[in-house]
Amino acid sequence: MPRIAQAFARARAENRAAFVAYLCAGDPDFDTSLAACRALLASGVDLLELGVPFSDPLADGLTNQLAAQRALESGMTAARVFELVRRIREFSEAPIVFYTY
């Protein structure tokens, strides 16, 4: 069974909602994002959603717009988002999805 389906099945079996956490990858920088992901996953997050920063996120609210701006200013790119996932995979097999335009 795929990781995402397993996460929801496990939550359902435990009679609870799945805990899905969102972070803008690279906000405020790569290392802080990695540390935040590690902390969230250690805290029991079932599924991690990583926002891929975009230069013109008009559909997002101000908070996500500013997060994307900080991430881009710190050098985050699509390639670095995949590097972040590779680093997360060193300590977690939790499902990861992307939020992108």
Predicted region positions:
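N-terminal amphipathic alpha-helix/helix-capping segment at the start of soluble metabolic enzymes
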Residues: 1-20, 86
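Short secondary-structure boundary/capping segments within folded domains
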Residues: 10-14, 28-30, 38-42
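Short, well-ordered coil/turn segments that N-cap beta-strands
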Residues: 14-19, 44-46, 90-96
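Active-site mouth loops of central-metabolism enzymes
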Residues: 19-35, 95-101
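Conserved, mostly hydrophobic/aromatic
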Residues: 21, 40, 48-51
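Glycine-rich, proline-tolerant flexible connector loops at the mouths of alpha/beta enzymes
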Residues: 27-30, 45-77
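Glycine/small-residue-rich loop that forms an oxyanion/phosphate-binding "nest" at active or ligand-binding sites
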Residues: 62-101
